[in-house]
Amino acid sequence: MSVERLSLAQLNAMDRPDFVSQVGWAYEHSAWVAEGAWEDRPFRTIDDLYTAMERVVRSATPQKQLALIQAHPDLAGRLRSMSELTVASRREQAGAGLDQLTATEAEQMARHNERYREQFGFPFILCARLNNAESIREALEKRLENSRAQEIDVALGEISKIGRWRLADAIS
């Protein structure tokens, strides 16, 4: 993950490996998204870059989309190990207050995460930055009512929100 913000001019001038190293992290452990978006340079706006990355995700095979979903960590779940989270995920989960859960709340979240994962075969994904611990718990419970196809679509939409925020943070 880049520490200092980059300009679009800098990104547009980069070769593919440098471009991927600078923005590939925006889509959790899925640099292939940035690799595909690089083809659409030059980007006039951050929205152009985001749109290119979304095109790559939405045109990917169902298997690649599922791999992207599965690359995401559980939100405050028992399976979460802080050392395994990316810096961005750690910061986003902390911002939603997930690092401040009581033992009871953490156990409840872990049970919901496990049920979700058992039901759908992938982790529950929600843009933590736009939520707090309570709204995350409520969304998790409500989304257990969805079909697997609905949840794949919702998860990709949440990944899109996460990617947009991360790109906005990284690019001036």
State where each predicted segment sits.
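C-terminal non-catalytic interaction appendages of large macromolecular assemblies
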Residues: 101-172
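Surface-exposed, charge/polar-rich loops and edge strands
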Residues: 19
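Aromatic-anchored, charged helix-turn/loop surface patch used as a conserved interaction hotspot
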Residues: 4, 8-13, 25-27, 32-112, ...
